[in-house]
From Swiss-Prot:
Keywords: Cell projection, Cilium biogenesis/degradation, Cytoplasm, Cytoskeleton. This is Centrosomal protein 20. Pfam families: FOP_dimer. InterPro entries: FOP_dimerisation-dom_N (IPR018993), LisH (IPR006594). It comes from Xenopus laevis (African clawed frog). One of its GO terms (cellular component) is cytoplasm. Signal peptide: none annotated. Residues 151-160 have a biased composition (Polar residues). PANTHER family: CENTROSOMAL PROTEIN 20-RELATED, FGFR1 ONCOGENE PARTNER/LISH DOMAIN-CONTAINING PROTEIN. The lineage of its organism: Eukaryota, Metazoa, Chordata, Craniata, Vertebrata. GO terms for biological process: cilium assembly; microtubule anchoring. It comes from the Eukaryota.
Length: 169
């Protein structure tokens, strides 16, 4: 007859194989955060840039079914429970989409666009700066990022398959 320890190990292994263990841990973290969140303390007003960034992240999280992470983001940032409309985001970001790019988060399309741009032509030399655990890139002095991308960002031929192909080159 199996011991309690054996039964626990089998249940744990089964939950991990089904992907449920990660969901349970995320759910517990989200619930703990919700319980500790002081709703009486007003959240700081988000700048328009932070609002757009948070909405792009929320759309990405929803697409990947990271619902508990999304709920923590919403609670921490004070985002409205109702996301901003995608057409509003694309208009604000000066993004032009095609049918393929509409099936994935805007963030995927933006990253794919800049990766393709990098592949298509020479980039200015970017100096890498290392810290203990991270590497950052410094934009060369005198380079104005507004001069680099003055027109709309054209998001085309972006799909999850395309994204994964680019990632594994």
């Amino acid at each position: 007859m199996a011991t309690v320890g054996d039964l626990k190990a089998v249940v744990k292994d089964t939950l991990e194989k089904r992907g449920v263990m990660g969901q349970l841990k995320a759910r517990v973290r989200a619930e703990v955060f919700e319980a500790l969140d002081d709703r009486s303390e007003p959240k700081p007003v988000l700048s328009p840039e932070n609002l757009l960034i948070n909405e792009l992240i929320r759309e990405y999280l929803a697409f990947n079914k990271y619902s508990y992470t999304s709920s923590v983001l919403t609670a921490e940032t004070g985002l409205s429970e109702v996301p901003l409309d995608r057409s509003f985001l694309t208009k604000e970001l000066n993004v032009v989409e095609d049918l393929n790019s509409q099936s994935v988060p805007i963030l995927y399309g933006i990253v794919a666009h800049f990766l393709k741009e990098h592949e298509d032509g020479p980039c200015q030399k970017v100096e890498k700066v290392s810290t203990e655990n991270h590497t950052f890139r410094n934009i060369p002095r005198g380079r104005n990022t507004k001069d680099t991308h003055s027109g709309p960002v054209q998001l085309t031929q972006t799909s999850t398959e395309d994204w994964h192909q680019r990632r594994h080159r």
